[in-house]
């Protein structure tokens, strides 16, 4: 009987914290499967999920306010360990008979908590030991309310001068609560605390590993697809590349990929995709050269959102035309990943805002009547990358910087023209090449060049040049929600600028974008 890598699972209830997905990623890193669900998850669904433990995440609400979120009673009836984090601790305290009040002194940022109670959760975990033998932890706080009275039979776990009950526990029930955030890297021992709860207290086995995920996904694909044929839109990005490798391993020649070359790709990208998948891996790939169709449809349009929609519609037209030439296709594969699923579920329930629609083949006409295969829908991006390496994809492909679905179409400000795309492709290639040479490519999270439709005077030799301006953009980020502009060495910027201006006749000036997010976004359009 095949190993069920989902058997040992953790349920995470989301109360609206910006850190909730981070908790899930930390649990997965420990090697245990988990799922995120809204705080008002149905009691029957909780029982059917049958978790080995439950984590109550943080949230922006105040427990003592009317209609604030509450944990379902079913969680406390399961008889499994429960770990409340920040708001999760507060609602646990309130619901089990304790009391929560607003605090005059709010705690945001770094703090040191004293570990004052001996519990299974924090036993032997510390950052400091003072002269009196008191253990201390360096943690990240983000709260305005605090627990002022614990439920019956609970004990104080940790405290700070302004928050005497910064943690509480009941070892008999295996209920724990902390006011700080163990999931963020600023809490130095956060990983150990979560591991202690999940592996030791909940008794989970670390079954969620790249090799086991690959085996499970291949088995699931074969069971779902059988002998039918599958179609995949291959973009060359990480998600679709991993899906292609996974499907090819699972069903071989039953997979056909369509690679749409829209004329807005990076330098040599089309050739690289074909070489990797068609030549090296033996995947059936149809290359649709549609540059002229995309550029004709984009002609005269300068509005960023309208450009995105034109590119999306044209992609669907080209993909649909190619797929109609194929026979016996029953399934459409997509690179949907877990954050997409979470965002979609939140949008349907009204509990989250849709950031933007995803540019993929999800908008294909319904008359295609294909069933979906989404082998990555349980995985976060970092898990997709690790799975790609497990499947034998090159490191440089798996850890390539993000590239927007509309490609260079949103890195050319204003109207898109072939001349602009060709210049931008070459400039971007030089920037990335020099970042790699200087060992900076993997130190930054994303780097690219933006084409600006303005001209600037330059001097080349004895001649005057009036040519286009480009901007270099490089950022450092963990989650792409916030980002800091990368402080690249001046010598590196000088080299990149010199090469672009000297090697590309149509560019006379190079600027460097020093805007962080917020207030700026990472992409210019």
From Swiss-Prot:
Catalytic activity: XMP + L-glutamine + ATP + H2O = GMP + L-glutamate + AMP + diphosphate + 2 H(+)
Active site residues per record: 86, 181, 183
Protein name stated in the entry: GMP synthase [glutamine-hydrolyzing]
Domain of life: Bacteria
Stretches assigned to the Glutamine amidotransferase type-1 domain: 9-207
GO molecular function ontology, one term from the record: ATP binding
Binding annotation for ATP: 235-241
A Pfam short name: NAD_synthase
Gene: guaA
GMPS ATP-PPase domain: residues covered: 208-400
Function: Catalyzes the synthesis of GMP from XMP.
